[in-house]
Amino acid sequence: AKLARKMLDDAGLTDTGVVLSNDLDEFTIKSILDSGAQVSSWGVGTKMVTAYDQPALGGVYKLAAKRLGDEGEWEPIMKVTGQSSKQTVPGILDIRRYFHDSEKLAGDMVYDINYGISRERIVDPADELRQKDLSNKRYITLLEPLARKGKVVLKDEYRNALIARDYCREQLELLDESQTRIVNPHSYPVGLEYDLFYRRHELASRLLGLS
């Protein structure tokens, strides 16, 4: 690409662009740009439309609470295994998204709506020592109901793919640039509400016969 650009410029064809293609992905493109190549446009196909890096979605629904009848009290339940990373989070869950004063994203908190929030601090579910204080920050609640008693109740504005795309782009713009870089990005803070973390730990210990 660098040689092609030089040859075109030397021939006076400065308005002719350089187009690159052939199995390009974000890592290859970044490497080419870092080398100083002046590329006008990119042809990205195979690795974009085929979900090349992860062709299978490993998502599985896990029950988090149960109750008897419509009026019964919800009972938190969870899946427990020998691997803490595969243990589910019990309860009727929702998510708060917190913002810095700059309006950049500060972090997301998973909490149980039946217990509320005792303190605005999140704990990494995989590492008790990784905690973040989110107190005194503006927040919004993220989750919207999809169905109630077998009927779809999702609001019309959430069914539009273009609106969803635009919302995703807006939220990505609110991330710190250190969290969106391709190589060695910083992780975005997401964790369990303080008391939920310890209720989950206590329930897992009891189910595994450790307490």
Question: Where would I find each of the regions flagged by the language model?
Answer:
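A small/polar active-site loop signature that marks catalytic segments
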Residues: K2
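Gly/Ser/Thr/Ala-enriched C-terminal appendages of enzymes
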Residues: K6-A11, T16, L24-S211
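Small/polar loops that bind or transfer phosphate-bearing groups
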Residues: L20
